[in-house]
């Protein structure tokens, strides 16, 4: 079995599973309780926060544990926008954001009258900093920009955007860091980011674990109320075992990061080179400034789902669009925004790698893909 759908989810590390089970069994107290079991659990929860902050180089930030990045994005965007509603009602985002961002913004537009400006991207999936500058208005209160696009892997100019926004202290800066964390380095504090979303199951943690990284002094209107937990940003008894497992996954992902990054980059380049040799294959991932784990390509004339299931028959698992949108059977919105056209957008396949995979995965993939494409083309004549 060759699993090449790691941008959708990754297999949890054994150590993460073990620490989750141990924490659930030994530290079952409610962190808000005043007795010893509560105090011990609260200390463990705080230790998990501190470990995450150390690993990510954060000093002036707090960690709000969430059920994942979808919740973190919702909490960040809605919480920030509603906290600023008396100041202004204009928000800027890119046109290729994850649905948890775009649908949150559209909800703010529909329910509260916010005006949303979506920055277009070029053919490689990059936004223009000049477009960002031009879009800023006196009533702009929030900018949201994903770090790494989840479909094609383009890396947005977050640091440059942060420099622009430092000149506008009234504007909050949110970054969806889900596909970038421990794939593409990002100095969160240096970039001037106010809110940053991460998800544990994208780097061998557990589903249902994630966090919103919040800069000190950033005010958010809570989406979940009913308690003072997590400084009132997210009410409800904290999922201590989930938080500890997230910290463990981050700790493991950070170990020997540079070496593993080099390996992943080499495997990606091998895939890109081999795919470019196949007649009719269009590579959608940009050659420069793209993440080391994502390769997106299209075979115009062959539907993505058909190609996906053909590979599945060979025990090779890939994906089409974002996993959150895959069952809609629509052409990739990201590729359409990049100007690729319906044929390319409707036939795109995403390969996404994990830390442990080497060049050994490329050969069996190509051995299945080449004859598979040939067979499908012959059937369509």
Swiss-Prot record:
InterPro entries registered for this protein in UniProt: Aminotrans_V_dom, Cysteine_dSase, PyrdxlP-dep_Trfase, PyrdxlP-dep_Trfase_major, PyrdxlP-dep_Trfase_small
Top-rank taxon: Bacteria
Alphabetized Gene3D superfamilies for the sequence: 1.10.260.50, Aspartate Aminotransferase, domain 1, Type I PLP-dependent aspartate aminotransferase-like (Major domain)
Residues of the active site: 324 (cysteine persulfide intermediate)
Record-listed N6-(pyridoxal phosphate)lysine modification sites: 202
Residues involved in pyridoxal 5'-phosphate binding: 69-70, 150, 179, 199-201, 237
Cofactors (names): pyridoxal 5'-phosphate
Enzyme Commission number: 2.8.1.7
A Pfam family that the UniProt record links to this protein: Aminotran_5
Binding site for [2Fe-2S] cluster: 324
Enzymatic class: transferase
UniProt entry keywords in alphabetical sequence: Iron, Iron-sulfur, Metal-binding, Pyridoxal phosphate, Transferase
Similarity comment text for this entry: Belongs to the class-V pyridoxal-phosphate-dependent aminotransferase family. NifS/IscS subfamily.
The name this protein goes by in its record: Putative cysteine desulfurase IscS 2
Organism whose genome encodes this protein: Bacillus subtilis (strain 168)
